[in-house]
């Protein structure tokens, strides 16, 4: 693989040299005079920012604020193209070089002729055969989210997101396209492409985004080979336009709150339950009727008098631990502009997000705060330069810095083993104002205040060089493109520890009649915050290289758009433990040869195909390559003469079928090799004085381990009637997923070895997707209504499982999350049912209870 990548790098140099040489030769052959002109709308108003160029040439100029432009190297009878978003392209012929041209652009009422992003290309949406969904960056900005993909649920059909954690800096949002379609939990995420480069979507905010497109069927993702089976999310960022400098400043201040809290049992119910348990056990009650009444009153929010306020408590530990709201501040500055030669776009964002912890834990140690805080700085710049009429260069740079300050005690521990598990019958503070902690119960405020501090710093750098060469002087419609990207990532973590004073007192001693007579016992001692100690440091870098050619040309009623390219991807990760020489190194490399073509006849009939030959060095030399492909067809019925009508803006039927893969299966590096670990040993010499450690084969390798295969068929319908008064799309799909990595559970344990997972499982999935909307204008008011519907299901058709004792335990033939187990018959109750601890509670099973055998019910 190293030799292949070296060869490709060398080949890329020669190809780039050829592009530059071709551009130079084309320049030397050009000649002519200068011609001036103006671009206007039908009413004579100037159109700024219109793109103007001579036919057969790719060098463009942009009109200024008054619609004026100047073209060089023009000659008699040359054709001049003028186009602008929202208008139809117009082509005029130069008849007099001394007379300024006036080019009129008619409004474009066909919104479906605009280009949309697909795999490594752009297509008019009218002629797309793929199943896609798209949302603009402007719409994304309306959603007050700190994690971009959390807004996708409401905007993109077929996309589901689930936020498992909302900790500042550690927000974990799972994302699925067309649902969960594989048994392997490590292989469910879609591929994310930012400006045609594989990248993590979490480094982006909504401000620099122009649009997001989701590729959903296998025909659309085939060019991504063994990376595209779960769908692809294409993110396109904003670029600068020629004209005056535009500055936009945005400041957003918001507040976040908990969506819900666990409802713990109150002290009154716990007291009753404890007495009931003792009664059933034949023992005397733990609480008297008078005590039960006091617990009832305090549980109802009453304040008790005298010494009772120091003996009877109903502490809501969630209210103590959490605050009602936490601030979120987002600031953004965008600057864009340029001229005919160079254009730029710059975006700078700052995000500050605080966690939901109360400030109670901070006051016990004045050297630090226990609040969970994220400070994030995000910078992005996109630069486009017209080197000459045949060569354009783009340079994209971006970076992000995250500083995360948080308690070392994790949210799960503070919530589950703190607020949920803590006994409401115990106080937060002693009467003397010190924290209350005894040996049998937890205090979440103490846990928070004595948790110390953890600092995480993440730094990310992104860079992309994009070179486009126009080879039309050689062959009309031919162009070439080179993309090189380099990304780097670095993370550093350090921790500090501390201690907090805490006491207990004998509040159950009824002989005490004055609060000053309580006996206090110190249970925890104060410790100053220690100096930071480094935990670990990790860094990685990623290189992408893509080079190819594109041929885009129209012959009468025939249009051909074809491209061929080679693509490489290499990633290296280094992790080093603090103050040791221990660490980890890993790398990941891909190589693919790709081609795609689209043919359109008379704007009515469309066929396209794509193919990718991809290899990954993670598998055995004999099992590294596979071929992925996709085909599609579409009939644009609204272009037929018998349906052409001003009320039918679009009516299109499309279908596709393709094969894609997924190699990120979670199997680790080189799963075909066995792993070894230390285990036992043997003593040699007199009295076995010399001990030699032993090693065992801890897990067997599997040379048959490979990537998942997805084959999917998709049928869709798109429509737009009465100028978007009724528009939408409908898709049906079915997928056959095979070679899913699963555990071999039928191997006998007597072999004494952990078997490697095997590419053996199979799942079938199907679903429907519907988007329907209405847009209208009444007077000066424009309104829109849009609805999204996604439905999908799956079925396990093959996996390795032993023959179950009863049929309902079988997983094969059921949905991925639908098979039953004994544990699913229970739900976890709040940890305060009995004695401050939770109970398992039997719940009604949704399926037929007769399916459960009597012996199992008795066992339960």
Where are these regions (language model features)?
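Short Pro-Gly-centered beta-turn/loop motif in secreted/extracellular proteins
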Residues: 44-48, 70-78
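Membrane-proximal, glycine/serine-rich, low-complexity loop/turn segments characteristic
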Residues: 20, 24, 30-31, 95, ...
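Short, acidic Ser/Thr/Gly-rich low-complexity loop/linker segments typical of extracellular
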Residues: 58-68
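Structural motif
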Residues: 34-48, 199
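Short, acidic, small-residue-rich periplasmic hinge/interaction motif at the N-terminus
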Residues: 40-43, 51-55, 79, 83-88, ...
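Extracellular/periplasmic, surface-exposed regions of secreted and cell-surface proteins
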Residues: 382-401, 406-410, 418-421, 440-497, ...
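Cleavable N-terminal targeting peptides that direct proteins into the secretory/outer-membrane pathway or into
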Residues: 1-34, 88
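Short strand-edge motifs at loop-to-beta-strand transitions and within beta-strands
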Residues: 69, 90, 99-101, 758
């Amino acid at each position: 693989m190293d030799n292949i990548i070296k060869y490709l790098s060398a080949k890329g140099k020669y190809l780039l040299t050829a592009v530059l040489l071709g551009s130079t030769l084309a320049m030397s052959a050009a000649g002519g005079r200068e011609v001036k002109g103006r671009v206007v709308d039908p009413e004579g108003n100037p159109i700024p920012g219109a793109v103007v160029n001579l036919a057969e040439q790719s060098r463009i100029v942009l009109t200024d604020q008054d619609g004026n432009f100047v073209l060089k190297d023009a000659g008699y009878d040359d054709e001049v193209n003028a186009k602008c978003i929202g208008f139809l392209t117009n082509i005029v012929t130069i008849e007099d070089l001394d007379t300024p041209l006036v080019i009129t652009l008619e409004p474009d009422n066909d919104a479906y002729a605009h280009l949309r992003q697909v795999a490594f290309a752009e297509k008019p949406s009218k002629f797309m055969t793929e199943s896609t969904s798209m949302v603009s960056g402007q719409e994304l900005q309306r959603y007050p989210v700190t994690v971009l993909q959390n807004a996708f649920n409401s905007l993109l059909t077929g996309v589901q997101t689930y936020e498992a954690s909302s900790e500042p800096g550690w927000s974990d949002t799972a994302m699925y396209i067309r649902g969960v379609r594989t048994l392997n939990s490590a292989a469910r995420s879609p591929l994310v492409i930012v400006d045609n480069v594989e990248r993590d979507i979490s480094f982006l905010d909504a401000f620099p985004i122009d649009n997001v497109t989701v590729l959903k069927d296998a025909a659309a993702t085939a060019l991504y080979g063994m990376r595209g089976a779960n769908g692809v999310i294409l993110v396109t960022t904003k670029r600068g336009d020629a004209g005056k400098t535009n500055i936009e400043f945005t400041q957003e201040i918001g507040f976040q709150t908990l969506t819900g809290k666990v409802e713990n049992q109150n002290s009154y119910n716990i007291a009753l339950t404890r007495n009931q348990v003792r009664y059933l056990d034949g023992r005397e009650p733990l609480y008297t009727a008078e005590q039960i009444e006091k617990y009832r009153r305090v549980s109802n929010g009453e304040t008790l008098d005298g010494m009772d306020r120091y003996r009877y408590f109903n502490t809501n530990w969630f209210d103590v631990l959490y605050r009602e709201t936490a601030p979120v501040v987002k600031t953004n500055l965008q600057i864009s502009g340029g001229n005919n030669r160079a254009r730029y776009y710059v975006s700078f964002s700052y995000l500050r997000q605080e966690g939901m912890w109360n400030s109670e834990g901070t006051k016990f140690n004045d050297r630090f705060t226990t609040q969970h805080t994220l400070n994030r700085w995000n910078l992005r710049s996109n630069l486009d330069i017209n080197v000459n009429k045949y060569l354009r260069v783009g340079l994209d740079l971006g970076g992000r810095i995250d500083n995360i300050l948080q308690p070392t005690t994790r949210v799960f521990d503070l919530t589950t083993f703190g607020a949920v598990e803590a006994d409401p019958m115990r106080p937060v503070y002693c009467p003397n104002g010190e924290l209350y902690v005894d040996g049998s119960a937890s205090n979440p405020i103490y846990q928070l205040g004595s948790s110390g501090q953890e600092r995480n710093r993440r730094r990310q750098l992104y860079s992309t060089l994009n070179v486009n060469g126009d080879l039309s002087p050689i062959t009309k419609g031919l162009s070439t493109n080179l993309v090189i990207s380099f990304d780097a990532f670095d993370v550093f973590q350090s921790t500090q520890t501390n201690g907090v004073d805490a006491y207990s007192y004998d509040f159950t001693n009824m002989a005490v009649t004055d609060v000053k007579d309580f006996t206090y016992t110190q249970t925890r001692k104060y410790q100053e915050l220690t100096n930071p100690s480094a935990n670990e440091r990790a860094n990685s870098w990623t290189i992408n290289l893509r080079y190819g050619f594109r041929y885009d040309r129209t012959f009468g009623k025939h249009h051909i758009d074809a491209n061929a390219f080679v693509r490489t991807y290499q990633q290296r990760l280094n992790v080093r433990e603090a103050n040791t020489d221990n660490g980890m190194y890993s790398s990941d490399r891909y190589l693919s040869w790709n081609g795609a073509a689209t043919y359109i006849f008379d704007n009515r009939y469309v066929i396209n195909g794509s193919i990718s030959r991809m290899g990954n060095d993670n598998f055995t030399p004999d099992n590294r390559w596979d071929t992925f492909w996709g085909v599609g067809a579409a009939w644009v019925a609204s272009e037929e003469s018998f349906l052409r009508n001003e009320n039918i803006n679009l009516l299109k039927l499309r279908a596709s079928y393709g094969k894609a893969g997924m190699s990120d299966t979670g199997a680790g590096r080189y799963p075909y090799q066995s792993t070894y670990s230390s285990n036992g040993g043997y003593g040699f010499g007199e009295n076995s004085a010399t001990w030699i450690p032993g090693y065992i084969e801890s897990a067997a390798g599997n040379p048959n381990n490979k990537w998942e295969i997805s084959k999917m068929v998709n049928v869709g319908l798109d429509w737009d009637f009465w100028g978007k008064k009724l528009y939408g799309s409908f898709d049906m799909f079915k997928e056959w997923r095979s070679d899913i990595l699963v555990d071999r559970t039928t191997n006998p344990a007597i072999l004494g070895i952990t078997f490697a997972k095997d590419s053996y499982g199979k799942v079938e999935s199907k679903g429907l997707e519907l988007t329907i909307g209405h847009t209208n204008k009444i007077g000066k008011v424009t309104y829109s209504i849009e609805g999204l519907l996604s439905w999908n299901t799956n079925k396990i058709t093959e996996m390795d499982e032993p023959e179950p004792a009863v049929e309902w335990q079988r997983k094969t033939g059921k949905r991925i999350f639908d098979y039953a187990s004994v544990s699913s018959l229970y739900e976890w109750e709040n940890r305060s049912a009995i004695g401050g601890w939770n109970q398992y509670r039997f719940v009604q099973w949704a399926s037929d209870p007769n399916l459960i055998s009597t012996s199992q019910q008795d066992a339960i």
